[in-house]
Amino acid sequence: MGLLDPSQKEVLKFAVSCRILTLVLQALFNIIIPDHHADAFSPPRLAPSGSVDQLVEALLGGLSRWDAEHFLFIAEHGYLYEHNFAFFPGFPLALLMGTELLRPLQGLLSERSCLLVSVALLNSLFSVLAAVALHDLGCLVLHCPRQAFCAALLFCLSPANVFLAAGYSEALFAFLTFSAMGQLERGRGWASGLLFALAAGVRSNGLVSVGFLLHSQCRGFCSSLVVLDPLKGLVKLMASLCLSVLTVSLPFALFQYYAYTQFCFPGSAHAIPEPLLRLASDRGYRLAGDYEPPWCSRAPPLIYSYIQDVYWNVGLLRYYELRQVPNFLLATPVTVLVVWATWTYVTAHPWLCLTLGLQRTKDRESLEKPHPGFLSAKVFVYLVHAAALLAFGGLCMHVQVLTRLLGSSTPITYWFPAYLLQDREPLLRCVDTAPQKLLENSPPGQKAPRNCVMKLLYNWKTCSPVTKCILVYFLTYWLLGLIMHCNFLPWT
């Protein structure tokens, strides 16, 4: 789709506006609300800060809370501590590239200030590009421009908004993942595999995305059985499946090998500044060269699974404690959304789901009448991906992470609400396909918006209960996340 497409221009404009508003509000909340004293990773600042650095910290310091501090530390100092290896290198490398572009300002700003500016600029860029990529993907998969347009606008108001703005890897991951999905829908398998591999170097759940490549190849194999020799086709399929798995898992394997060389080889210690050594001693952080950690003798020697187990207590049902009830409540809306989406799709297409999306229906007639929108047959693999992430995250992870995990990994969390809005909201149900037709019912004396989300907000009183629930969820988490996360309050 061209950049001059009206709906794409509207998505771009709305995404940029939301990014600007996000940065302004986080600065405001960071200034007027005192920070909570959280027991979080807080390394000492090695370089003195000037007045400009203090200004940058006041305006953008809200982007450096919680896990963002790990990414900033890795970008500045590298992987010094063992627990730093819980955070993949893709985003820190992007930050380093951003600071290189800011090199002319390094006489004025400290390295940390340059990193904060890089976070603000790069994550704003990645979030905008992710919104455009999601719109493009929606048009390819849903075959319903209205739902694709609405879903992209909802992404701009994502409940995971603060994590798309702060020094987290979600924005870059969403951009790479949605772009990879779009390339695969266009039949560009190599480009898709490369983008999925890059995404796997940004976040660990990128490894799950190999399922899209595997499903696409299996679907191609099934459709070619009538014209190809089955044995020859099966050999070709197995080779392509293995290549896809190797391609997507390569960044993860290289990262694990790098950790192994740092902690499991004698004499791998590096010179470390005294304040960082003192921090390691005070907090019990393990450094390379201290002594060989237990994971070095495991088979395979994976530092990532060890860190998740020992440092973060990640494991099956480990988070199911009474004191974690508030975090389960935080994750309830996105859980309900994905479960509802799964139920809606499975009940609409039971045969499609039983055949794993490889054969759409028993009835040849209905094959010729594909469902547009969320109920499209192409949505099946995306729904399985979302359900798998929800199941694993809900059973094995810190459940409050589900909002940002699903919000940055799967389009289902935006396609399904868009489907509900189009299906249940009278204000949108009767509107034509083109977004520029969304012009009626706006307040007197005001120009009616093309933006369907803004249209619903302008006509809030007449919206259906389902619409109000969706908008309240998106807007509340969008704003509350900024208020709490930027001040070290528990929103992680």
UniProtKB/Swiss-Prot annotation:
Membrane-side (Lumenal) residue stretches: 35-77, 135-136, 183-192, 256-327, 400-468
Principal location: endoplasmic reticulum
Cysteine disulfide partners in this protein: none
Lineage top rank: taxon: Eukaryota
TM helices/strands, residue ranges: 14-34, 78-98, 114-134, 137-157, 162-182, 193-213, 235-255, 328-348, 379-399, 469-489
Topology with respect to the bilayer: Multi-pass membrane protein
Subcellular compartments: Endoplasmic reticulum membrane
Pathway: Glycolipid biosynthesis; glycosylphosphatidylinositol-anchor biosynthesis
Stated role: Alpha-1,6-mannosyltransferase that catalyzes the transfer of the second mannose, via an alpha-1,6 bond, from a dolichol-phosphate-mannose (Dol-P-Man) to the alpha-D-Man-(1->4)-alpha-D-GlcN-(1->6)-(1-radyl,2-acyl-sn-glycero-3-phospho)-2-acyl-inositol (also termed H2) intermediate to generate an alpha-D-Man-(1->6)-alpha-D-Man-(1->4)-alpha-D-GlcN-(1->6)-(1-radyl,2-acyl-sn-glycero-3-phospho)-2-acyl-inositol (also termed H3) and participates in the seventh step of the glycosylphosphatidylinositol-anchor biosynthesis.
Listed GO CC annotations: endoplasmic reticulum membrane; mannosyltransferase complex
Cytoplasmic side: 1-13, 99-113, 158-161, 214-234, 349-378, 490-492
Top-level EC class: transferase
This enzyme's EC code(s): 2.4.1.-
Family statement drawn from the similarity comment of this UniProt entry: Belongs to the PIGV family.
GO molecular function, one term: mannosyltransferase activity
UniProt name for this protein: GPI alpha-1,6-mannosyltransferase 2
One Pfam family named in its UniProt record: Mannosyl_trans2
BP-aspect Gene Ontology terms: GPI anchor biosynthetic process
Keywords, ordered alphabetically: Endoplasmic reticulum, Glycosyltransferase, GPI-anchor biosynthesis, Membrane, Transferase, Transmembrane, Transmembrane helix
Originating organism: Rattus norvegicus
Post-translational modification summary for this protein: Not N-glycosylated.
